């Protein structure tokens, strides 16, 4: 498993710069997506939308198809989260990510479900997260054998 923590290092998306001579950070990000068997996105919702750095990163992959047919799970964990979750699901549809219902989880009122160390303390939430991860692994396995 690789955790990508470099969203803030990616330059703002510019379609005029979207060729093979992109910044090293973009090339590396795209390669990590290509090399991954699957992707798990976990994000808050900001102002009823997708955080800008996440949307920017995804925009860099639109014309190069890194997410196309890639098993991609989405967890939105926020105070509400509904609007950002739906917006990101639409973006995943546009980029043709493989995102079935079993790979989607909305965790509203997240602050009531984690402790001071951000460890999940709510048993139902923990169970839902574990089920989503299991479903992602199953989807990857099916994807690998061409089912």
Which role does the model predict for each range below?
Residues 1-12, 64, 96-116:
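Mobile beta-alpha loop/short-helix "lid" or hinge segments that flank ligand
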Residues 1-43, 49-59, 119-147:
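N-terminal beta1-alpha1-beta2 submodule of the flavodoxin-like/Rossmannoid cofactor-binding fold
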Residues 45-47, 79-80:
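Short glycine-rich anion-binding loops that position phosphate/pyrophosphate groups of nucleotides
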Residues 56-64, 91-95:
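A glycine- and small-aliphatic-rich helix-loop capping segment at beta-alpha/alpha-beta transitions
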Residues 70-109, 123-124:
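Short, glycine-/small-residue-rich phosphate/pyrophosphate-handling segment
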């Amino acid at each position: 498993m690789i955790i990508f923590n470099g969203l803030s290092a990616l330059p703002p998306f510019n379609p005029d710069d979207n060729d093979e001579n992109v910044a090293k950070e973009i090339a590396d990000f795209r390669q990590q997506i290509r090399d991954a068997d699957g992707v798990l996105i976990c994000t808050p919702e900001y102002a009823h939308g997708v955080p800008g750095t996440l949307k920017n990163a995804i925009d860099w992959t639109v014309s190069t198809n890194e997410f196309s047919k890639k098993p991609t799970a989405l967890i939105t964990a926020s105070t509400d989260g509904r609007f950002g979750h739906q917006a990101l699901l639409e973006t995943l549809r546009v980029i043709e990510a493989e995102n079935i219902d079993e790979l989607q989880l909305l965790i509203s009122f997240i602050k009531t479900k984690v402790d001071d160390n951000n460890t999940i303390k709510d048993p139902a939430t923990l169970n839902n997260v574990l089920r989503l991860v299991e479903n992602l692994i199953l989807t990857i396995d099916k994807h690998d054998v061409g089912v």
